[in-house]
Amino acid sequence: MGNIIRVFGFAALIFFTTHLCVADSNQQDRYEAAPGLIDLRSTLSDGAHTIEELVQMARSRGFKILFINDHDRIAISYGVPPFRKILRYKKEFPSIMTNRPEKFLEEISRISEKYPDVIIIPGCETSAYYYWTGSWFKKDLTVHEYDRKILIMNFDNPDDYNLIPNLHNKLSFKYTKKLLPGVIIFIVPLIIGFIFLKWQWGFSPFMGMLLIIFSILAIINYNPFRSSLFNPYAGHQGIAPYQEVIDYVNQRGGLCFWNYLEQMSGIRKYGPINVNTPPYPQVLYQSRNYTGFAAIYGDNITATDPGKEWDRVLNEYCRGERARPAWGISTADFHEDGRAGEKLGYYPTTFLLKEFSRKGVLEAMEKGRMYCSRGDSRVWPRLDSFNVFGKDGRKAFMGETLTTSHFPIIKFKVSYNNEKQTPATLLLIRGGMLIHTFKGETPMEVEYVDRAAPPGEMTYYRLMDTRKHLTSNPIFVTYSETFEKCPLLPD
């Protein structure tokens, strides 16, 4: 009798869960695919076009979602000891901070009202940290990691920008409590200086004045009100300065993405200075709680190859070692239409939206319901559909999780938005392993049953083409044989 009750209870649970999932699937069928452009610069930093010109160009090419990511700051400085922050040379270029964040946000608000059919989301690109080695006199002065870039989305308040914890931002009280004890080492000689000054004996007034001046300069140089805990003369600091920025973005309700992980221009000469930013795909697994990274951009990328850094992060998420996965986007590094032969629209990210609104776009971005493409501003590869199904019709979209008692069924359709037949080779990746290669011409429609899916553990499926012009985000799946092998169910 007890076994019968357990069987009926288990069956009811299956029915109830299936009912909910099918209902949710019907809701998901109403997703709207909308291409957007990320990583755009305007004349408010180092771009050639105004924000309004960017909107007009994008609309004319079929894009109505724009992320404006001007530089928060473009600055670098080098100081000489003992007061490196006072005796320094600093070079700074136009940015959000030099133009004022208020002006940047007001301009986006004005253009958004003028073009209500376009969603414009403000943000920035930041260089969180850099450090120096070498010597100006030995002609080997080198700045490291300056080109490690983080894209920030959805910053709506001027203070969001004012308080970004990078090396050159405004004064902040965030770390004052932690830094204030360090001032004591300079307070002691300051007090001694006043004592010497009061004695008025021999060289004591002169020594007292020197101590006072030195101590005051040392306190200013130490600066317990600085925006970041780090300084550019302390050498390599690992992932910590970047994690500091990521944590800050999360606290402010923004989204953040690693950008240009393997750019080839990170090692170069800038006047008499060496710039040294080697490829840094390792930051994907070194850092935590970021939203994602640039999976397609105008340079080299290997982190998306099967079994590489992205898959390492996704597998850590599947094993419960990470709180969140990392999503891929396309980023443009767009400054001027036609520069280096590239135009606005070469790197679209297509979002699957519940509603065409700013809220809908940010929700899709945060949850990974999007895919990345590379094209020519008018034509690009399109992922018309990509789902994993259970046998009973339940399905999951990119960024979602499916639990099924049957072998997962992967279905996808790839085409080009000009509808022309184009040769394509698609890679289906499960858990970091290439499990099948599909060759043909677009439109290409595929159904594949994964009979080798690992039972009892979470994994994921993702797609990419061999040209790296199309990359999906993952769909997570747990395949469980429990239902089929339950000893209480009748044969």
Q: At which residue positions do the language-model features occur?
A:
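Short low-complexity, flexible loop/linker segments enriched in glycine and/or proline
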Residues: 80-84, 136-137, 271-275, 279, ...
